[in-house]
From Swiss-Prot:
The protein's Enzyme Commission number: 2.7.2.1
Keyword Cytoplasm set for record: yes
Cofactor comment text: Mg(2+). Can also accept Mn(2+).
Name under which the protein is recorded: Acetate kinase
Annotated residues for binding of substrate: 91
Subcellular location(s) of the protein: Cytoplasm
């Protein structure tokens, strides 16, 4: 069975085509700058080379039509006819409290995703554009929605409620939802497969750390807490997002700067985090280079960044009554060995010992990086959200 996975953003589409019989990735690529000058599709060809094709792409439907034409192209394609695609799996960012698992898309599901759109105004409408485009181009093709938030719907109320008037929750759904759920689910399961231990019996902390980042506590196979909240702003220090901050500080800044809600949103989403604190970049590689050169703000920023991750790991170990496995994933978690070392150092009190030699220089591969006598297994697992979406799509179709 061939399953196309789509991740539609406001001006982009990422895609992967899987042959689920073999688990092979048949094709992958993405479109950038939809509706803007200089739009292009980039793909990896059969020889592993990167190819860029420029073309005017006014909307998502034209973008997906372009993707289908490339998939069937004599030079770059891997299928003869797009009708060989059996189903489509879509990343949908926010399912609110409506969706605790992936679902086959119908009109009722679309309506509920629209209702959740005020919780993810930049993402859900774009995700639905992909759904509508596929229905227009291949009418009747089965489509499945896989939600970033669904995995975290097992959190207890004491973990997801904020200390605000209860009416804010009842009227507007103001609570912690969490994100990166598909990634946290994939890497936690994959870690247990690698280690040969039963998923349902473990206390796992997953650290998805990249330009965006979140930590999740998984007890007996269920998410019991996560660092992101109503929005992806809460929690860790991120590339341009502030992470945890005193809400009173925000009202103070608004008053001092004469700032409205839109200005505040821009501040905490786009002008804060690693970039705002360092004044250098949102890229941790550039921060590490500046640290090596002795830049004091870079040093402070890196310390804040690592400290925040360490603090959440400790908090979630306390919340679960211990930790059996710590999983690193995401762009930084998979590749920045110095961050992994800095966070895991001095955690021996909770049975966590990192193998400095194994960790150093290790990038982008599955590997245990804890010492043999570490009570907590520390493991790096590169995430594969697209495969998880394809697997969910296959499972739902098998149940039809």
């Amino acid at each position: 069975m061939k399953i196309l996975v789509l991740n539609c953003g406001s001006s982009s589409i990422k895609y992967k085509l899987f042959d689920m019989t073999s688990g092979e990735v048949m094709a992958q690529g993405g479109i950038e700058k939809i509706g803007l000058p200089g739009a292009f599709l980039k793909l990896t060809d059969k020889d592993g080379k990167k190819v860029v094709i420029e073309r005017e792409i006014p909307g998502h439907q034209e973008g997906i039509e372009f993707i289908l034409s490339v998939l069937t192209d004599a030079t770059y394609g891997c299928i003869k006819d797009y009708k060989e695609i059996d189903a489509v799996g879509h990343r949908v960012v926010h399912g609110g409290e409506e969706f605790a698992s992936s679902v086959l898309i119908n009109q009722d599901v679309i309506n509920k995703v629209i209702e959740c759109s005020d919780l993810a105004p930049l993402h859900n409408p774009a995700n639905l554009k992909g759904v509508r485009a596929m229905e227009a181009l291949i009418p009747g093709i089965p489509q499945v929605a896989v939600f970033d938030t669904a995995f975290h719907q097992t959190m207890p109320d004491y973990a997801y409620m904020y200390g605000l008037p209860y009416e804010m929750y009842k009227k507007y759904g103001v609570r912690r939802y969490g994100f990166h759920g598909t990634s946290h689910r994939y890497v936690s399961r994959r870690a247990c497969e690698i280690l040969g231990v039963p998923y349902e019996d473990q206390k796992i902390i997953t650290a998805h750390v990249g330009n965006g980042g979140s930590i999740t506590a998984i007890k007996n196979g269920k998410s019991v807490d996560t660092s992101m909240g109503l929005t992806p702003v809460e929690g860790l220090l991120m590339g341009t997002r502030c992470g945890d901050v005193d809400a009173g500080a925000l009202s103070f800044i608004m008053d001092k700067e004469g700032m409205d809600g839109a200005g505040l949103s821009d501040l905490i989403n786009k002008r804060s985090g690693v970039a705002g604190l360092s004044g250098i970049s949102s890229d941790m590689r550039e921060i590490e280079a500046a640290v090596a050169a002795g830049n004091p703000r870079a040093i402070m920023t890196l310390n804040v960044y690592n400290y925040r991750i360490k603090k959440y790991i400790g908090a979630y170990a306390a919340a679960m009554g211990g930790c059996d496995i710590l999983v690193w994933t995401g762009g930084v978690g998979e590749n920045q060995w110095a961050t992994r070392r800095a966070v895991c150092e001095n955690m021996e009190y909770m049975g966590m010992k990192i193998d400095v030699e194994k960790n150093e220089g290790m990038r982008g591969e599955e590997m245990v990086i804890s010492t043999p006598d570490s009570k907590v297994t520390i493991i790096v697992v590169p995430t594969d959200e697209e495969f998880m979406i394809a697997a969910d799509t296959l499972e739902i179709l098998d149940k039809k």
